Regions:
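Positively charged n-region of N-terminal signal peptides that target proteins for export
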Residues: 1-4
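N-terminal signal peptide c-region/cleavage motif recognized by signal peptidases
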Residues: 11-15
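N-terminal (or domain-start) structured segment
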Residues: 18-109, 146, 155-157, 167-203, ...
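Hinge/capping helix and adjacent helix->loop/strand transition within the periplasmic-binding protein
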Residues: 21-22, 50, 73-83, 97-185, ...
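An extracytoplasmic/periplasmic, membrane-proximal ligand-sensing/linker region
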Residues: 22-24, 261-324
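Solvent-exposed loop/turn segments at secondary-structure junctions
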Residues: 33-34, 90-93, 121, 130-131, ...
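Short, surface-exposed alpha-helical segments at coil->helix boundaries
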Residues: 38-46, 158-162, 232, 281, ...
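Short beta-strand->loop
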Residues: 106-117, 151, 174-179, 200, ...
Length: 324
């Protein structure tokens, strides 16, 4: 009986992992280096590789057009599990359909989406050289009529900017979003602001901005969403002044269209275990990242995609792009 049970267990394991990568996996990131999707994936890949030491992941940054360059590329790759993509939710599932609709070659659900690997609140930051020190002063600034630039590095960041402008009745003629190919160059632009060059304000994930906030290179004015950040107890929530700004940076693992079921299952099984791990929890605490248990499956991720679209597309579609 013991031999039979052992044989059944061995067989079940073999079936569960009938497929695994047999050559290096190319990991496409639609941002410049240092974005939240990249840093979260690198940590998870380290955890997965401890269980699968023969598996190698090679990150390839492919920035441009708010991830459209990367997403167009992944559409053309074989669905054999050796090329994956790390889309940002708001960009790939929502705002590409509004701001990049003329250059994208995919639908939001064209791909084989696997699971969400992490989320991070967005933070409104200011340069230390700015005279704006809090949310009330930022509100006054965006309605003052003076020229103001706000650095954004992705669809979620731009969405938060539009909500701030709408709720705060900011001057559309004076306050402009400045687009960067990812959050890292956006936060660096704020850190480099000197009154003439750089950008005075920015919006990006705190997971990316944290080192510069802690180092005093930029100042955190407020967080999006409803989660208080114990790592930053003195930073208020944007919703305290502008209700409804419930926007997060979020990232997932994605395969090319029509990926085989066993390939999807390998990524879902191994990366969901890594997301739930103690090692990742410690990393998340340090980097201000969280995850949703309900989004650790393809079906759960798809529900989130549809919810995002229902909530934000009607609002964002009303933006007048002719002024840009």
């Amino acid at each position: 009986m013991k031999k039979l049970l052992a044989l059944l267990l061995l067989t079940a394991t073999a079936v569960a992992f009938a497929w695994e990568p047999t050559k290096p996996v190319t990991v496409i990131v639609g941002n410049t280096p240092g974005a939240g999707n990249e840093i979260a994936f690198r940590k998870l890949a380290d955890i997965v590789q401890k269980q699968h030491p023969k598996v190698v992941f090679v990150v390839q940054n492919m920035p441009g057009a708010d991830s459209v360059i990367a997403n167009n590329h992944i559409m053309l790759q074989p669905a054999d599990g050796h090329t994956i993509n790390l889309p940002s939710h708001m960009s790939s599932y929502v705002t590409n359909d509004i701001w990049e609709k003329n250059i994208k070659k995919y639908n939001y659900d064209s791909f084989s989406d696997v699971l969400t690997i992490g989320k991070s609140p967005l933070v409104l930051i200011a340069s230390p050289r700015s005279a704006v020190n809090n949310l009330a002063e930022f509100q006054a600034a965006i309605t003052s009529g003076r020229p103001i630039n706000v650095a954004v590095g992705g669809g979620a960041h731009r969405t938060a900017f539009e909500y701030l402008m709408d709720r705060g009745k900011g001057s559309r003629d004076a306050v402009r979003p400045i687009k960067f190919n990812g959050p890292m160059p956006a936060v660096v632009s704020v850190a480099q602001y000197d009154g003439k060059t750089g950008t005075e304000f920015g919006i990006m994930p705190i997971a990316v901005a944290r080192p510069l906030v802690e180092g005093g290179k930029v100042r955190a004015l407020g967080f999006t969403g409803t989660r208080r950040m114990p790592q930053f107890p003195n930073v208020p929530m944007l919703q305290d002044l502008w209700p409804g700004i419930n926007v997060y940076a979020a990232w997932s693992i994605q395969l090319p269209p029509a990926a085989p079921r066993d390939v999807v299952e390998w990524y879902q099984t191994n990366f969901s275990a890594a997301v739930r791990s103690k090692e990742y929890a410690e990393w998340r605490e340090l980097n201000v990242v969280f995850y949703e248990e309900s989004e650790l499956t393809p079906a759960g991720l798809k529900r989130n995609m549809d919810e995002l679209r229902a909530a934000f597309i009607p609002v964002l579609s009303r933006i007048d792009l002719s002024k840009e």
